[in-house]
Curated annotation (Swiss-Prot):
Residues 2-181 form the KARI N-terminal Rossmann domain. It comes from Bacillus anthracis. One of its GO terms (cellular component) is cytosol. Residues 182-327 form the KARI C-terminal knotted domain. Mg(2+) 2 binds at residues 190, 226, 230. Mg(2+) 1 binds at residues 190, 194. Binds 2 magnesium ions per subunit. The active site is at 107. Its EC number is 1.1.1.86. Substrate binds at residue 251. GO terms for molecular function: ketol-acid reductoisomerase activity; magnesium ion binding; NADP binding. This is Ketol-acid reductoisomerase (NADP(+)) 1. Keywords: Amino-acid biosynthesis, Branched-chain amino acid biosynthesis, Magnesium, Metal-binding, NADP, Oxidoreductase.
Length: 336
């Protein structure tokens, strides 16, 4: 079982007198920066010129270039997209690190797959909230928190664990609980969850169900409601109380259908395919492919995204969501 730390376990916050540079001011960046500041930390933000720079300024932060922020900080938290981190680290962060500094991540991808190679004289750890930035910020402001993971990759000072827990405490995560892990475990389980279940698995399942109904002659609008729209209702029940709560909350007919039909859809062959996905994550195949795709300008990424956005389920969904003003995306989808 995972070891979990709470507020009572952080008796002395060893980072309170240190300067923390938050590199990036997107979903996680703004939440980390604001939570740390509210908890009395000395926070600066490191960015390239753009909308985020202006937003961080409006929010009252001292904003610098990435290099300037890294140079003056004791703790550098990198909250940029995975594919951008290696270049920014190499050009702007690495030259400004000093012995005893802390290099921090919210995901272990680049360290685990050797895209970022920290010097031996700095602490390296991760603190990864298990929720999007807006939720990290909102729950903190309400007096609660989102649980987080932490892991130490390199302990140059002998107090890297204390630093990691102090950072987690600073963003409020110790209110809910902070689970100890490793860079390897966090990276591989996170990627697997995204690919096999949360993103890849769910989208493939939803599309397959939609296509099955439409191909059988049912109206696309009904297929959308049954296979996509109502998914949130079921996921919310699982989120609140696990599979048991979902099954308790639905009809007996639905629960019996779950028991007799679910295993025929997600079969042993499906689990074998999941095993292959996991193996490709573990041996670096996925990482190498994604890194190569990014370096090539992401042609397949953009082409696939465009094709997926033209699928009938998306066309029907846009139409139906237009009839439901209470269903609005938090962020308008577009080109990344």
């Amino acid at each position: 079982m995972a070891k979990v730390y709470y507020e009572k376990d952080v008796t002395v916050n060893v980072l309170k007198e240190k300067k923390v540079a938050i590199i990036g001011y997107g979903s996680q960046g703004h939440a980390h920066a604001q939570n740390l500041r509210d908890n009395g930390f000395d926070v600066v933000v490191g960015l390239r010129k753009g909308k985020s720079w202006d937003k961080a300024k409006e929010d009252g932060f001292s904003v610098y270039t990435v290099a300037e922020a890294a140079k003056q900080a004791d703790v550098v938290m990198i909250l940029l997209p995975d594919e951008l981190q290696p270049e920014v680290y190499e050009e702007e962060i690495a030259p400004n690190l000093q012995a005893g500094n802390s290099l921090v991540f919210a995901h272990g991808f680049n360290v685990h797959f050797d895209q970022v190679k920290p010097p031996v004289n700095v602490d390296v750890f991760l603190v990864a909230p298990k929720g999007p930035g807006h939720l990290v910020r909102r729950t903190f402001s309400e007096g609660g928190a989102v649980p987080a993971l932490f892991a130490v990759y390199q302990d140059a000072t002998g107090v890297a664990t204390e630093k990691a827990l102090s950072y987690a405490d600073g963003i409020g995560a110790t209110r809910a609980g902070v689970l100890e892990t490793t860079f390897k475990e966090e990276t591989e389980t996170d990627l697997f969850g995204e690919q096999a279940v949360l993103c890849g698995g769910v989208t493939a399942l939803v599309k397959a169900g939609f296509e099955t109904l439409v191909d059988a002659g049912y109206q696309p609008e009904l297929a959308y409601f049954e296979c996509l729209h109502e998914l949130k209702l079921i996921v919310d029940l699982m989120y609140e109380g696990g599979l048991e709560n979902m099954r308790y909350s639905v009809s007996d007919t639905a629960q019996w259908g779950d028991f007799v039909s679910g295993p025929r859809v997600v079969t042993e062959d499906t689990k074998k395919a999941m095993g292959t996905v996991l193996a490709e994550i573990q041996d670096g195949t996925f990482a190498r492919g994604w890194i190569a795709e990014h370096k090539a300008g992401k042609p397949n990424f953009y082409a696939t995204n465009e094709k997926e956005n033209e699928h009938e389920i998306e066309v029907v969904g846009r139409k139906l969501r237009g009839m439901m003003p209470f269903v609005q995306p938090r962020v308008k989808a577009g080109v990344k």
